[in-house]
């Protein structure tokens, strides 16, 4: 590899690292909402999986404890899936054109 090509590659890697850091900061600000029980349980979290809010409809508080636990778990799982999808979508624009194997997840 020529010296100029190596320098160009290093510069490109540094730029990508800076862009990745900016994207991580943006993802920490993006909130997604997971729901279960037709919206009776809602979980709001960032794309960095920091939970911001859990909302439980008062009608569920008198119901079966097991049902409530299942709905909370389902809402969390829904929020995590949405956060992952949003992260992949945002990161996809940064990694387009890179020869990454299928299913490879960024950030590392």
Curated annotation (Swiss-Prot):
Keyword DNA-binding among UniProt keywords: yes
Pro residues: bias regions: 99-108
Keywords for the protein's UniProt record, in alphabetical order: Cytoplasm, DNA-binding
Alphabetical list of Pfam families matching this protein: YbaB_DNA_bd (PF02575)
Tagged with keyword Ubl conjugation: no
Disordered: annotated span: 86-108
Function in brief: Binds to DNA and alters its conformation. May be involved in regulation of gene expression, nucleoid organization and DNA protection.
Protein name stated in the entry: Nucleoid-associated protein Rmet_2128
Species of origin: Cupriavidus metallidurans (strain ATCC 43123 / DSM 2839 / NBRC 102507 / CH34) (Ralstonia metallidurans)
Taxonomic lineage of the native organism: Bacteria, Pseudomonadati, Pseudomonadota, Betaproteobacteria, Burkholderiales
